[in-house]
Amino acid sequence: MRRLGHHRLHGKTGGVGTKGMVAKLSIGVIVLLICTLSLLFSANIGSNREPTRPSKINVEELWESAKSGGWRPSSAPRSDWPPPTKETNGYLRVRCNGGLNQQRSAICNAVLAARIMNATLVLPELDANSFWHDDSGFQGIYDVEHFIETLKYDVKIVGKIPDVHKNGKTKKIKAFQIRPPRDAPIEWYLTTALKAMREHSAIYLTPFSHRLAEEIDNPEYQRLRCRVNYHALRFKPHIMKLSESIVDKLRSQGHFMSIHLRFEMDMLAFAGCFDIFNPEEQKILRKYRKENFADKRLIYNERRAIGKCPLTPEEVGLILRAMRFDNSTRIYLAAGELFGGEQFMKPFRTLFPRLDNHSSVDPSEELSATSQGLIGSAVDYMVCLLSDIFMPTYDGPSNFANNLLGHRLYYGFRTTIRPDRKALAPIFIAREKGKRAGFEEAVRRVMLKTNFGGPHKRVSPESFYTNSWPECFCQMNPKKSSDKCPPNNVIEILDSRLESIRDPDSTSQTNSTVTGLER
């Protein structure tokens, strides 16, 4: 009997639901809708033209998703995609370092690396986060069974490397440790890594953040990344439940916007933006930077002028006001502890008093106990994913914002507001020097040049995880054959191929691996 998670890939739908419908759905149903939309293609679509930029900012339109231009999410294979072979070349272990979303992209890369090498992937290890001191691990954050089941057409996955039983003796396989180069090309995995795997039966790649090149000239490999990121990586039920509780309460009062307010100590120290703080606070930031980042000459005025400083809370408020959002706008803040305290939040709160975070929306003990660390970040991620509008205030090296931008694009071109900090910097600097005439009009001109969530070409340095168009999207009536949606029976095709290589006796075998290795 097939599992529920597998059936979610089969459900029929009449197309992308209206905004009102989405507002009434629970997170579980919405996730189901996301999966269904990307693998089935029975909806009506509009024109194949990409949407043009608006001539003015219409706040009411921003509460709706951007025009799709006839594109829809699709990470299903479109060419010959054989299932994992019965025998693989060995086991692949990886240690994913960084925060929740840096680890998330590393997991996507690990699955792809396993596919490239025809390896059995050992459930990825999540590094105990150095900032949150969180050691929840993969099993504590993600739905393991769903992860394995969803990727059964792509790679074999086990919980740990099994022991070898031979001649009545048990032998443990020790993985050979390798430090992969940053942004390693596919060739490195097919030569250096694969050679070591065949020699030692298992390899351990550590650290594994940004260890596989993002730009790969193979659309099927890129679509596998999307299958991992947007389908296989599902948070555990209790995290989804906490997120659902918050979203339901926010939606009960209408539209809401989420903002990733990146004004925390680690980001400010990384950016080298110290001068707006008092001497004691600057001392704290300099100490943190010295302990955690490479030594570099950083001058605040120069950094700010080129858009390298995170927006302050007040600047965020001024941008929204210039765009003509009013003070009744409900805003959910996804942020850790803001550095500098209330003195920086007060101007923002004056402009937009309806500010919330996960603790203020749902002050339950259960949520309070998990509000910090990776679980708290996971809850923030889900709320931001499902919000009507998402605004990152610093989407440079911020993996949280980058992943969310890509996920919301895949989710149906949901509206995002991405301030161009470099273009806005001289406007804010002039305002601070007393030049306030024409300030809001100048901000609006900058914001009109940004993309609010529709399909757009990925241009370096934009990350694949921020924008997976066009590889992970398709059209029913495309101009190019490579953009054509796969057939409706793609799952049945993959199923039949998988069944053809299965060992009929595998279901009776047991070992120390995660149940589901041979599903």
Swiss-Prot record:
Its EC number is 2.4.1.-. Substrate binds at H260, L261, R262. Glycans are attached at N118, N327, N357, N511. Disulfide bonds: none annotated. GO terms for cellular component: endosome; Golgi apparatus; Golgi membrane; Golgi trans cisterna; trans-Golgi network. Residues 1-24 are cytoplasmic. The keyword Membrane applies. The chain crosses the membrane at residues 25-45. It is a single-pass type II membrane protein. It holds the Pfam family O-FucT. This is O-fucosyltransferase 1. It comes from Arabidopsis thaliana (Mouse-ear cress).
